[in-house]
């Protein structure tokens, strides 16, 4: 098993069977010691965050597989904080697909002159480039085509899948009395050039509230999974 990439919140290994092993860490994104799923840097470490992230990811990927939504998920080992997944090629050098139900985070920081913080949004969809030095800028459909990162058809499929997946997650959280404010996903292409959901779905890449109270990732895991 060879280490091929050290990420902010996960280490990635190549397996002999051709698949990939993801090792979840206790590091989470944020700034100045405060967790923020929209940040592009590790802000702090929380004991148990890796295990909580894997448990949530396992739960949501199994739900998506039940709905025949394509993902890279193969299996997981909660005791070792690892998940085996199929190989996938990312779009360009990596994109993040964001669905927003409230005007918070970077959306509000960008558009605060035009909208009040917390204003409901109807599943607003946007894409950002994974580029720490550039601050993960947003990218338009036209720019994706111009740079040959994704085709127009792929863009529409990615938008449709993002809204479908996030809608399912939002409904599950609603059943627990929780409100999804925003969430970011990642997609790639499998060996047959089919778009599939990759990476993870956990409290570390979403903002969830109960009333006016923000629910931090570890507590969210317990509220969703018990």
Describe the residue ranges of each PLM region.
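Conserved metal-phosphate-binding beta-hairpin within the catalytic cores
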Residues: 99, 180-200
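C-terminal helix-cap and adjacent tail motif
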Residues: 109, 201-226
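An exposed, glycine/acidic-rich loop-and-rim segment of catalytic or binding clefts
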Residues: 119, 123-136, 142-150, 219
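Short histidine-centered catalytic/ligand-binding loop motif
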Residues: 37-52, 138-161
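Active-site loop/lid in soluble adenylation, ligation, and acyl-transfer enzymes
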Residues: 1-129
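A long amphipathic alpha-helix within ATP-dependent nucleotide-binding catalytic cores
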Residues: 149-181
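A short glycine-rich, hydrophobically flanked beta-strand micro-motif that places a catalytic Asp/Glu
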Residues: 72-77, 81, 174-189
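Phosphate-binding core of ATP-grasp and ATP-grasp-like enzymes
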Residues: 121-135, 166-179, 203-204
């Amino acid at each position: 098993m060879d280490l091929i990439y050290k990420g902010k919140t996960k280490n990635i290994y190549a397996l002999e069977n051709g698949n990939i092993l993801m090792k979840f860490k206790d590091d989470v994104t944020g700034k100045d010691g405060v967790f923020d799923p929209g940040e592009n840097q590790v802000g702090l470490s929380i004991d148990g965050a890796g295990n909580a992230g894997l448990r949530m990811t396992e739960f949501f990927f199994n739900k998506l597989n039940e709905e025949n939504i394509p993902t890279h998920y193969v299996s997981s080992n909660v005791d070792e904080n690892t998940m085996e997944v199929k190989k996938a090629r990312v779009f360009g050098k990596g994109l993040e697909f964001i669905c927003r139900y409230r005007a918070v985070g970077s959306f509000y920081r960008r558009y605060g002159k035009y909208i009040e913080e917390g204003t409901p949004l109807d599943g607003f969809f946007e894409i950002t480039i994974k580029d720490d030095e550039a601050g993960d800028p947003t990218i338009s459909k036209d720019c994706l085509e111009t740079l040959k990162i994704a085709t127009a058809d792929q863009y529409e499929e990615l938008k449709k899948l993002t809204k479908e997946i996030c809608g399912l997650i939002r409904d599950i959280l609603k059943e627990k009395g929780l409100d999804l404010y925003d969430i970011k996903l990642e997609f790639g292409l499998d060996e047959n050039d089919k778009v599939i959901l990759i990476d993870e779905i956990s409290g570390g890449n979403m903002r969830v509230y109960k009333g006016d109270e923000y629910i931090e990732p570890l507590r969210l895991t317990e509220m969703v999974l018990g």
